[in-house]
Amino acid sequence: DRDGSIEVQSDETLGHLSDWLSLKTMALRQLNNLSAKSQLDVGQRLKLDFSRVGRREFEEKRLAYHKNVQDRFFKQFHVVKTETLTLKEGDSAWLLAQRYRVPMWLLRQYNSTLNFNLVGTGTTLTVPQVKKQPN
């Protein structure tokens, strides 16, 4: 955003973000008041330091990373159908992704209008069903 912050996406780590910014991980931890043991959550907002790398270069590196993750996935799997499911008590989007063996980034793509920070019991999700690509 204009304030120099981003929303953490699936599969991103503090190490990735630091690399893309040419910063030490500790610098990002300090900027965001994160302890050494803190884990990033998808959807979490983080302040970034663009003093060494411009926003455009950062975004190019970030997009290339995500494209690579998706390309590798689709070389192995393809979506055969989708199913609409409603979360029950004790369910979460993460558990659903685990149960159906789909990455969170793919589940988020199929439910792009949902705020995943607010997903809970009663939320309806479209779940892609994947199958291994034939050799």
Summary of predicted features, one role per range:
Residues 1-135:
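Extracytoplasmic low-complexity/disordered linkers and repeat tracts associated with LysM-containing
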